[in-house]
């Protein structure tokens, strides 16, 4: 049962990430969508981690949804992609802002529910 909950949550999270990317990044040359979904995922996972949830609920929302929503691999490829087209400063800003905002969002989420 837990595996099915993770799969369902993952499908919903990945679909949310895909739709966010289709809508947001169609208007920008900077990886805004990946930044947004990763920070949102950190906030949600922080909220879930601080809350008293059943194992099944955490599997659905934490492991599944947040796991499908967030994407470290796309973050890495987009960072390198900016470097490849000689946009070093935007790449560095993207990396630093992503890590800082993700940590801050996770901390905030945890603080709000613990």
UniProtKB/Swiss-Prot annotation:
<dbReference type="GO" id="GO:0062054">
    <property type="term" value="F:fluoride channel activity"/>
</dbReference>
<dbReference type="GO" id="GO:0140114">
    <property type="term" value="P:cellular detoxification of fluoride"/>
</dbReference>
<comment type="function">
    <text>Fluoride-specific ion channel. Important for reducing fluoride concentration in the cell, thus reducing its toxicity.</text>
</comment>
<protein>
    <recommendedName>
        <fullName>Fluoride-specific ion channel FluC 2</fullName>
    </recommendedName>
</protein>
<feature type="transmembrane region" description="Helical">
    <location>
        <begin position="30"/>
        <end position="50"/>
    </location>
</feature>
<dbReference type="Pfam" id="PF02537">
    <property type="entry name" value="CRCB"/>
</dbReference>
<keyword id="KW-0479">Metal-binding</keyword>
<comment type="similarity">
    <text>Belongs to the fluoride channel Fluc/FEX (TC 1.A.43) family.</text>
</comment>
<feature type="binding site">
    <location>
        <position position="67"/>
    </location>
    <ligand>
        <name>Na(+)</name>
    </ligand>
</feature>
<keyword id="KW-0407">Ion channel</keyword>
<keyword id="KW-1133">Transmembrane helix</keyword>
<keyword id="KW-0812">Transmembrane</keyword>
<dbReference type="InterPro" id="IPR003691">
    <property type="entry name" value="FluC"/>
</dbReference>
<dbReference type="GO" id="GO:0005886">
    <property type="term" value="C:plasma membrane"/>
</dbReference>
<keyword id="KW-0406">Ion transport</keyword>
<keyword id="KW-0472">Membrane</keyword>
<keyword id="KW-1003">Cell membrane</keyword>
<keyword id="KW-0915">Sodium</keyword>
<dbReference type="GO" id="GO:0046872">
    <property type="term" value="F:metal ion binding"/>
</dbReference>
<feature type="transmembrane region" description="Helical">
    <location>
        <begin position="88"/>
        <end position="108"/>
    </location>
</feature>
<keyword id="KW-0813">Transport</keyword>
<feature type="transmembrane region" description="Helical">
    <location>
        <begin position="57"/>
        <end position="77"/>
    </location>
</feature>
<feature type="binding site">
    <location>
        <position position="70"/>
    </location>
    <ligand>
        <name>Na(+)</name>
    </ligand>
</feature>
């Amino acid at each position: 049962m837990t595996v099915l909950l993770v799969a369902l949550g993952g499908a919903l999270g990945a679909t949310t990430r895909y739709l966010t990317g289709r809508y947001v990044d169609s208007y920008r040359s900077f990886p805004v969508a990946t930044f947004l979904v990763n920070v949102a995922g950190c906030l949600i996972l922080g909220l879930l981690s601080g809350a008293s949830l059943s194992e099944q609920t955490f599997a659905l929302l934490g492991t599944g949804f947040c796991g499908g929503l967030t994407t470290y691999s796309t973050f890495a490829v987009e960072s390198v992609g900016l470097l490849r087209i000689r946009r070093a400063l935007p790449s560095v800003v993207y990396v630093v802002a992503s890590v800082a905002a993700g940590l801050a969002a996770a901390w905030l989420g945890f603080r709000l529910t613990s």
